[in-house]
Structures are given as C-alpha cells and as structure tokens.
C-alpha cells in the first residue's frame, strides 16, 4: 500500500509521509465515514481473530485522528486501536505504526505505546506461468531465484532483530502472497509455488518470535 495509490516507489519516497496534515472533509463525507466505520465494527465485532482496529491506512482520507481514535476505543474498549497504520502520527491510541521499504527501519519511537513496523519487505520475484499480469509486475526490490529472495528476507530479518532490541514490538512483512501485479509475495498469485526456502524462513521467523523470551 503506497500513499500515491501504487504508481511507483519514486513517488512514494517523495510523499509527505507523517507531517500531521489530516484531510479536511465535508460534513457529508465525515458523516459517511463515521457511519461506515461504525458498521464495520458492528459487523466484525464478534470475530475473535480481530485484536486491533485500524481507522486509517497511510494517511488515505485520514482526518480528526485523535477524535476518531477516542471514539473507537470507547465504542469497543475490548480491543486495541492503531490510529493510522503508516499514516500521520499522533500521540493517541495504543500503537505507533511505521511503514518502511524495503528493509526495516526504526525512525520514530514511542515509549508509552507499542512501536510496530506495520509494513516492510516487498522482495519481488516474477515467476512466469504464475502471474496475474504477464508483462507488468513490480516489487520494491527484484530478484530472479528463490535463493536470492530467501537471502534478502533473512538479511532484513537479521536487521529487524537488532531493531527489536531498540524498541520494535511487532513487524509485518509485505507480503504472504503475490497480489495482482505486486510480485513480492512468499507464494505466487495462484498459490501453486512457494518462492522461498521454507525451512530457512521458518527458522529465522521463529528466532524473531522468540527474541524477547529471555
């Protein structure tokens, strides 16, 4: 997910990423957002797999962040609230969520809330015969073999281990599967080919998961 709508990493890098400038919505737009956000929570309230509500992603349509976060926490006090995943950051809610590509980076920290890396990675490998589009694919970095993808993943994971010691509480890799023209999945778009060395990926992931069990 890029703030420019997916038109390319160059524009993503130039985007004003966390300057705190929320959108100014019309009264009708705000009312529609509030209505639909409440409907989403009402519909998904009983799903035990949902542990965090995220009102905004990467500043898309983000507005009145502290107010929306406060309402969400009061409406469902049983769950954590991540005010904006990779968006304009405010000192509200339970989580400070950073996005960084391709490798992990801890460029902001909050000692009160959980500091998480909500997105990183994007290691691309286009595998012919398993693509959504045959000739238009991208990743933040691109490789040609499973060995190269695995080695790059492990390199990022090793760096992540260092950042966990400095303050990260969680991290989310982009992404599990290819998504349309995004070929940065660990598995192809058709779910037929795993593009990495499974035992090596499992080993480094377990090392990360157990890194705080000391």
Tell me the role of every PLM-derived stretch.
Residues 34, 49-53, 70, 108-214:
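Substrate-binding clefts and catalytic carboxylate motifs of secreted carbohydrate-active enzymes
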Residues 1-95, 100, 104-112, 131-135, ...:
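Active-site mouth of glycoside hydrolases
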